[in-house]
């Protein structure tokens, strides 16, 4: 069993976080979840619930631990806590800017800072469009320091029909980077 941190910031795309946490837990991994106040609002607006756990099948709850964003004293704040990867999905441009400047003023930003300084996998899923030059500079700075930047761009050649299809595709890309085996991972096969 591996241990993953999933941070959820206030950008649109709550379904991506729900899908990722559900699949990691279904695969038997421990998932530490940190939700920003803005993400709580987005969760309510997009999925009509105030409880993140209410969006996850109850049989998976045993593998999920929710942390308060203000719990800077959490063991997750320390590089001595072993974590296999940190994923922030969706990741707002405000969170990207803070991480790129090394701001660790809450648990969500701190775990990203720890991942960078400890040279552990950090996957950021920025959900913003269009991107300004400032956004691009921040993303470049993070990529140059080891972060994987994974914009939630659907793989159109798989012909998604629903929002769930798109979420599954994007989460499959995250899981592939983590080198996990999941039915959500799709591989291109030339039909001709």
From Swiss-Prot:
Protein name (database record): Flavin prenyltransferase UbiX
A UniProt-annotated Pfam family: Flavoprotein
Entries under PANTHER family matching the protein: FLAVIN PRENYLTRANSFERASE, FLAVIN PRENYLTRANSFERASE PAD1, MITOCHONDRIAL
Entry-linked SUPFAM superfamilies: Homo-oligomeric flavin-containing Cys decarboxylases, HFCD (SSF52507)
Residues holding dimethylallyl phosphate: 157, 173
Keyword Transferase tagged: yes
Family statement: Belongs to the UbiX/PAD1 family.
Alphabetical UniProt keywords: Flavoprotein, FMN, Prenyltransferase, Transferase
Chain positions recorded as FMN binding sites: 10-12, 36, 92-95, 127
Originating species: Chlamydia muridarum (strain MoPn / Nigg)
Coiled coil spans: none
Source superkingdom: Bacteria
Catalysed reactions, semicolon-separated: dimethylallyl phosphate + FMNH2 = prenylated FMNH2 + phosphate
Cited function: Flavin prenyltransferase that catalyzes the synthesis of the prenylated FMN cofactor (prenyl-FMN) for 4-hydroxy-3-polyprenylbenzoic acid decarboxylase UbiD. The prenyltransferase is metal-independent and links a dimethylallyl moiety from dimethylallyl monophosphate (DMAP) to the flavin N5 and C6 atoms of FMN.
UniProt-listed HAMAP family: ubiX_pad (MF_01984)
InterPro entries: Flavin_trans-like (IPR036551), Flavoprotein (IPR003382), UbiX-like (IPR004507)
Entry's Gene Ontology molecular function annotations: carboxy-lyase activity; flavin prenyltransferase activity
Enzyme Commission number(s) of this protein: 2.5.1.129
Signal peptide positions (record): none
């Amino acid at each position: 069993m591996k241990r993953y941190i999933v941070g959820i910031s206030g950008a649109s795309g709550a379904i991506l976080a729900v899908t990722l946490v559900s699949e990691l837990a279904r695969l038997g991994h421990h998932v530490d979840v940190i939700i920003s106040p803005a993400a709580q609002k987005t969760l309510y607006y997009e999925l009509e619930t105030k409880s993140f756990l209410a969006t996850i099948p109850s049989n998976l709850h045993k593998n999920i631990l929710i942390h308060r964003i203000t719990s800077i004293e959490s063991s997750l704040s320390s590089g001595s806590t072993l974590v296999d990867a940190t994923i922030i999905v969706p990741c707002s441009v405000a969170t990207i800017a803070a991480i790129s400047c090394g701001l660790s003023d809450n648990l969500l930003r701190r775990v990203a800072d720890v991942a960078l300084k400890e040279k552990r996998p950090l996957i950021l899923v920025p959900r913003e469009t269009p991107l300004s030059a400032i956004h691009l500079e921040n993303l470049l700075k993070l990529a140059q320091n080891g972060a994987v930047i994974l914009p939630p761009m659907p793989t159109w050649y798989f012909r998604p029909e629903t929002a769930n299809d798109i979420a599954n595709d994007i989460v499959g890309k995250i899981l592939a980077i983590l080198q996990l085996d999941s039915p959500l991972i799709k591989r291109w096969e030339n039909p001709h």
